[in-house]
Curated annotation (Swiss-Prot):
Annotated Gene Ontology cellular component terms: cytoplasm
Subunit-level organization: Homotetramer. Interacts with BrxC.
Protein name per its UniProtKB record: Glyceraldehyde-3-phosphate dehydrogenase 1
Site (Activates thiol group during catalysis): H179
Length: 335
């Protein structure tokens, strides 16, 4: 039986989680909470400028969504503790508003009747941060109720950093994410707490910060203090890449690095880590469900132990598919 999921926040990630769940028989979205009315939610679910029209029948019945004949209850409650997850049969809540990333705030969903909460972002004081393919085996149903799915960038970096570290050992590394713009930026110049993110997103390359590299240590403790980096926000609406330059503990060739990454992509990390030897560009990865896809043509080695690896990720679709995978995994291991 599919685990019943509620989504709090029906924005870019919330709607993409819904889309991903439609293709996963182990997960069923039964309720959505968002401060927008059902007609607008239905419209934005059905028509997407990045991912295209949803291949499903979408309509509205009163205040609820109806997708492929199934009713999804819609509410518009600001306080998570006042939601009706228990009455609605919701077992896992996907917290995707971007506002409730502290454990104490996200835990209000538990007060409302949910059994577990997945925060679709880096969190504060969460019970555990999980990156699928890297550390999901650490999940403990008895002690982990509020779980962070980390960031889309950490989901891209961690799987191939794990391969490099397991195979060759990482001494230190610096990463840059070349990241599509998001709703945390301005379309035209407007005030923002980050002076650079205040500038027009579709007109500029914007240097900014990311905690993704340091956050890798949350799922790979052996890399604590060994990775750091930053971000460049670029004028594309979706698909990003991670550029990692790392010093390894042993000398390697580019061929050896690619061989290790390809082996992992075809083995233990299949469906999480992809591997491509084609000369592709960002648009080719729109809709890609992997967390990370190695651009093998870009792998470089200098002086034996310094390696450069580039990996692509659909920062919306790939990440949202991992949220759904995590929900299914939690349901299997115990609520």
């Amino acid at each position: 039986m599919a685990v019943k999921v509620g989504i709090n926040g029906f924005g870019r990630i919330g709607r993409n989680v819904f889309r991903a769940a439609l293709n996963n028989p182990e997960v069923e979205v039964v309720a959505v909470n968002d401060l927008t009315d059902a007609n607008m939610l239905a419209h934005l679910l059905q028509y997407d400028s990045v991912h295209g029209k949803l291949d499903a029948e979408v309509s509205v019945d009163g205040n609820n969504l109806v997708v492929n004949g199934k009713t999804i209850e819609v509410s518009a409650e600001r306080d998570p503790a006042k939601l009706s997850w228990g009455k609605q049969g919701v077992e896992i809540v996907v917290e995707s508003t971007g506002f409730f990333t502290k454990r104490a705030d996200a835990a209000k969903h538990l007060e409302a009747g949910a059994k577990k909460v997945i925060i679709s972002a880096p969190a504060n004081e969460e019970d555990i941060t999980i990156v699928m393919g890297v550390n999901e085996d650490k999940y403990d149903a008895a002690n982990h109720d509020v779980i962070s799915n980390a960031s889309c960038t950490t989901n891209c970096l961690a799987p191939f950093a794990k391969v490099l570290n397991d195979k060759f050992g990482i001494k230190r590394g610096m990463m840059t994410t070349v990241h599509s713009y998001t709703n945390d930026q301005q379309i035209l110049d407007l005030p923002h707490k980050d002076y650079r993110r205040a500038r027009a997103a579709a007109e500029n390359i914007i240097p900014t910060s990311t905690g993704a590299a340091k956050a890798v240590s949350l799922v790979l403790p052996e890399l604590k203090g060994k990775l750091n980096g930053g971000a460049m926000r670029v004028p594309t609406p979706n698909v990003s890449l991670v550029d990692l330059v790392a010093e390894l503990n042993q000398e390697v060739t580019a061929e050896e690095v690619n061989a290790a990454l390809k082996e992992a992509a075809e083995g233990d990390l299949k469906g999480i880590l992809g591997y491509s030897e084609e000369p592709l560009v960002s648009g080719d990865y729109n809709g890609n469900k992997n967390s990370s896809t190695i651009d093998a043509l870009s792998t470089m080695v200098m002086e034996g132990s310094m390696v450069k690896v580039i990996s692509w990720y659909d920062n919306e679709s790939g990440y949202s598919n991992r949220v759904v995978d995590l929900a299914a995994y939690i349901a299997k291991k115990g609520l």
